[in-house]
Amino acid sequence: MKNTLNGKWVFDSNLLIYGLDKSSSRYHDVYHLFELGKEGKIQIIVAQQNIIETVHAFVKGYKSPIEEVIYNIKGLLDELDIYIITPINKTHSIFFEILSNSSDPSDIFDYYLAATMLDNGINRILTINTKDFSKIPGIEAVNPFN
């Protein structure tokens, strides 16, 4: 995989899940992205929401023990020195604006993630669900596997 990425990127929950699931067909691709972060070639950012969604996927979907999930996610965050963004006092206002300007709101949670990103001055996200973010002004969504 050739690196054409640089700078700050939010990693969507799907990438975190693939990167923690060694049986995933995307595991090695995401691992390469993690390596770029470790090497300082990109800055990996996640929102608190991504952490919650990843925990949910492993506990409810994979039926993994909560202790194992916490250990693995904390280890990933620490090992890669991942920067974590959070909603701020007015994130809901941007969320409502995005939502009200959408003709067909597809994924409410992605809209809230986009609002959190914009409030933190970040507009780029790596995700396999680019269509969910492509309708949101100010957000650049890239599928790293294309």
What would you call each of these model-derived segments?
Residues L15, E53-A57, I94:
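A general alpha-helix detector
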Residues K131-I139:
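Short loop/helix-cap segments at secondary-structure boundaries that form the rim of catalytic
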Residues M1-V46, Y62-Y71:
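Short, well-structured N-terminal submotif of metal-dependent ribonuclease cores
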Residues L20, F58, P137:
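Short, flexible helix/strand-to-coil boundary loops that buttress conserved ligand/catalytic motifs
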Residues S13, Q48, D107-Y111:
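Conserved glycosyltransferase catalytic-site signature
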Residues H56-I85:
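Helix-adjacent hinge/juxtasegments
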Residues K2-T4, I82-I128:
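Active-site neighborhoods of divalent-metal-dependent phosphate/nucleic-acid chemistry enzymes
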